């Protein structure tokens, strides 16, 4: 009787349902509410309560249907409209959620929760203008709602409204001056703007308010990494993990120790990161990079494999693993791996770094694509320094050469004499040494050749770019490109009005802020210009500079001392092991099988590379003893004397010899090369063309093999070519550094004049 009495009174019925819910008698409550719906069809409160029960039990669709039923009874219920918005948000039906939030706001424009939840959706949908308006409405309703200021600031920063973003952070600080999170987030904004000293100031303020502040300590550490102040970075990163473990802090500590060559500490922190998050691929990949750098390639491959099991699409992982395998001549699944990388590049995925792409493919279009993908991901144009000023035209053009290899390095050997011969009446020379190099004879020569030699190894990228601007460098010449020790971020900020890619990296950078690449017509014919993001400064002869006189020691080298039989024909390849492909190696082994008294001579590769090459040789039916491996000479003058023991140098494909080709040709050893299309392939062909030795350039694998056989079986022809080579080396303009210097200076002047005539960069033919 009591229940019947209750069911005749809507208020008593509703109270009873609430009582049952509070006593966890949910089923009884639902039964009463459903009965009440029938008895009181115009009373929407029962339907609303049923809807809430459904939503709280995650029966979202039932809840939505009940709320809609309630609106049929009374459409002017702002809270029901709001609840429908929440339900559709939970169901990820975002447009429907917005529709009901907007309807609710019409009836109840002061309900701040409507706009807070709508902001969540607009952020997901990346509808930034509407999102900004939404945050402004929240601030109107509650001027002290901090998240509306800080979240809006982040959006304004992302769309380039930096000053507006900064103003919002300052307002947030006025409202809550003792909130450490605001200072920390403000520091992040300055960090993103590369205003590092201001970032440090705000991180320190955050720590002053809250000393137990691991996030601010970590962020401070990362700022000091950017500033290349590694000891300070280590100190702050270690403070960030005093009371809690942090994956990012561990990986960054490991990366710093790796950069400082503290190998034991680097591995300790990579392993800590892996232990903390074994399901994350990042630490495995970074550990593999470190192991690569210390030549523990087998361990690097294992770390890459661990990362692959977690995330096959981790950026650059697949390409770097293949590069590591190639460096030890492990060619298992080589063709499949190459095919996969090609496919992923065409899908514009970050699958291989540019240098590896050059090693994998003789296709300048694919190389350009790989470089563009990499630049967009790693080093996009950075406008944090603002547009560069147009300097007045001066009598002397200020050239800035940027390199991490001003020391005992092949690039330095090639350009030292060029630096010395630059016309100081026309040019003022600045060197920016971007990585630490030990003192050496070559570095001393280079330092003397410049008007200013500036060691910026410990400067941040922004500081280097600013310094170049302060010095009013007219032309910045990047001698690194996409190679080790390069600092592409410097050029992404525009270090100079004219920026040039030269020598260190044999290919396009893919960067829209690099204006020119220096080359020659042989390497980049007109029909391949579209494969380069830069315009081309064409030198009239070979693009590669060379020393006029190379040092050759008087030390006597004999075949016997190198383990080479006296009476055999010596094929050799002194390229890096990662340039050797299974395809080219098969040709070399066929040569050994056809030329009975012959050997293949290599430099001192790693023990793993030697083992794998011997195994491949055995598989192909040739005695592994016919592969001879010599130690690498510490002094280049000894190297130049030693390589004369070879009869023929066999070039690799698709990534061919460059300075190595020059070394062997100067030593009187003919170089057989297989011409392709890419920059990294054609340098040897360009050198040979300029030496008037185009007969050493082959256009097919068959021609390559046949020419090698001809030399090995026709000693008179070999003698004739060697005599021609030695004569041409002495007579060729290839080794006339003064003539080369005049040509490259002509290219610089033309690029400079175009700029001051307000003309866009265009292809230039140096004189």
List where the protein language model places each region:
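Glycine-rich phosphate-binding loop and adjacent beta-alpha segment
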Residues: 674-675, 680-683
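A conserved nucleotide-sugar
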Residues: 426-428, 589-619
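Short Ser/Thr-rich beta->loop micro-motif in glycosyltransferases that lines
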Residues: 480, 651-657, 675
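Short, well-ordered beta-strand segments
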Residues: 398-400, 572, 601, 672
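The conserved SAM/SAH-binding core of class I Rossmann-like methyltransferase domains
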Residues: 432, 603, 674
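Substrate-binding clefts and catalytic carboxylate motifs of secreted carbohydrate-active enzymes
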Residues: 572-583
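Alpha-helical solenoid repeat scaffolds of the TPR/TPR-like class and their adjacent stem/linker regions
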Residues: 1-564, 576, 586, 615-622, ...
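Donor-sugar nucleotide-binding helix/loop cap in glycosyltransferases
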Residues: 650, 664
């Amino acid at each position: 009787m009591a229940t019947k009495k209750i069911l005749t009174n809507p208020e008593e019925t509703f109270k009873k349902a609430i009582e049952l819910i509070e006593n966890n008698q949910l089923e009884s409550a639902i039964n009463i509410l459903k009965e009440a719906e029938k008895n009181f069809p115009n009373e929407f409160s029962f339907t609303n309560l049923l809807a809430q029960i459904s939503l709280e039990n995650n029966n979202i669709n039932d809840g939505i249907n009940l709320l809609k039923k309630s609106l049929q009874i009374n459409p002017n219920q702002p809270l029901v409209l709001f609840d429908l918005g929440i339900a559709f948000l939970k169901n990820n039906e975002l447009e429907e959620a917005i529709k009901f939030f907007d309807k609710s706001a019409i009836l109840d424009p002061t309900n701040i929760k409507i706009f807070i939840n709508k902001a969540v959706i607009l952020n997901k949908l990346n509808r930034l203008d509407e999102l900004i308006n939404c945050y402004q409405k929240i601030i109107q309703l509650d001027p002290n709602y901090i998240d509306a200021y800080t979240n809006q600031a982040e959006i304004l920063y992302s769309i380039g409204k930096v000053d507006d973003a900064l103003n919002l952070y300052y307002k947030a600080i006025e409202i809550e001056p003792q909130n450490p999170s605001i200072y920390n987030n403000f520091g992040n904004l300055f960090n993103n703007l590369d205003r590092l000293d201001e970032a440090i100031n705000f991180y320190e303020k955050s720590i002053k308010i809250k000393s137990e502040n691991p996030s601010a300590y970590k962020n401070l550490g990362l700022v000091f990494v950017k500033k290349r102040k590694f000891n300070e970075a280590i100190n702050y990163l270690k403070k960030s993990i005093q009371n809690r473990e942090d994956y990012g802090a561990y990986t960054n500590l490991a990366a710093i120790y790796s950069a400082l060559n503290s190998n034991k500490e680097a591995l300790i922190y990579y392993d800590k990161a892996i232990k903390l998050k074994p399901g994350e691929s990042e630490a495995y990949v970074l550990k593999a990079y470190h192991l690569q750098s210390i030549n523990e390639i087998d361990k690097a491959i294992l770390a890459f494999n661990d990362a692959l099991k977690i995330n096959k699409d981790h950026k650059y992982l697949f390409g770097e693993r293949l590069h590591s395998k190639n460096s030890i001549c492990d060619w298992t699944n080589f063709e499949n791996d190459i095919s996969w990388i090609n496919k992923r590049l065409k899908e514009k995925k970050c699958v291989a770094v540019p240098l590896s792409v050059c090693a994998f493919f003789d296709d300048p279009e694919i190389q350009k694509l790989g470089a563009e993908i990499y630049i967009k991901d790693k080093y996009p144009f950075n406008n944090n320094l603002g547009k560069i000023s147009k300097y007045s035209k001066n009598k002397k053009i200020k050239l800035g050469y940027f390199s991490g290899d001003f020391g005992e390095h092949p690039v330095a050997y090639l350009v030292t004499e060029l630096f010395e011969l630059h016309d100081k009446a026309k040019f003022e020379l600045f060197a920016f040494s971007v990585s630490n190099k030990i003192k050496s004879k070559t570095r001393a020569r280079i330092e003397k050749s410049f008007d200013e030699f500036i060691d910026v190894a410990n400067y941040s990228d922004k500081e280097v770019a600013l310094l170049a601007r302060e010095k009013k460098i007219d032309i910045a010449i990047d001698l690194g490109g996409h190679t080790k020790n390069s600092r592409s971020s410097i050029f992404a900020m525009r270090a100079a009005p004219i920026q040039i890619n030269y020598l260190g990296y044999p290919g396009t950078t893919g960067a829209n802020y690099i204006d020119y690449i220096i080359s020659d017509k042989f390497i980049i014919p007109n029909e391949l210009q579209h494969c380069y993001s830069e315009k081309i400064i064409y030198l009239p002869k070979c693009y590669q500079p060379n020393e006029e006189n190379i040092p050759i020691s008087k030390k006597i080298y004999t075949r016997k001392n190198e383990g080479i039989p006296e009476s055999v024909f010596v094929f050799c390849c002194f390229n890096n092991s990662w340039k050797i492909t299974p395809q080219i190696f098969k040709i070399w082994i066929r040569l050994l099988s056809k030329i009975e008294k012959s050997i293949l001579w290599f430099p001192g590769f790693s023990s793993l590379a030697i083992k794998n090459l011997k195994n491949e040789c055995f598989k192909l039916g040739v005695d592994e003893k016919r592969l001879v491996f010599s130690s690498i000479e510490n002094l280049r003058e000894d190297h130049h004397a030693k390589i004369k023991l070879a009869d023929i140098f066999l070039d690799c494909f698709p990534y061919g010899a460059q300075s190595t080709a020059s070394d062997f040709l100067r030593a009187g050893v003919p170089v057989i090369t297989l011409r392709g299309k890419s920059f990294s392939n054609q340098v040897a062909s360009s050198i040979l063309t300029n030496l008037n030795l185009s007969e050493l350039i082959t256009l097919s694998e068959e021609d390559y093999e046949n020419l090698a056989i001809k030399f090995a079986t026709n000693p008179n022809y070999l003698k004739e070519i060697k005599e021609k080579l030695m004569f041409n080396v002495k007579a060729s303009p290839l080794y006339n550094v003064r003539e080369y210097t005049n040509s490259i200076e002509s290219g610089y002047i033309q690029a400079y004049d175009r700029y001051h005539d307000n003309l866009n960069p265009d292809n230039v033919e140096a004189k």
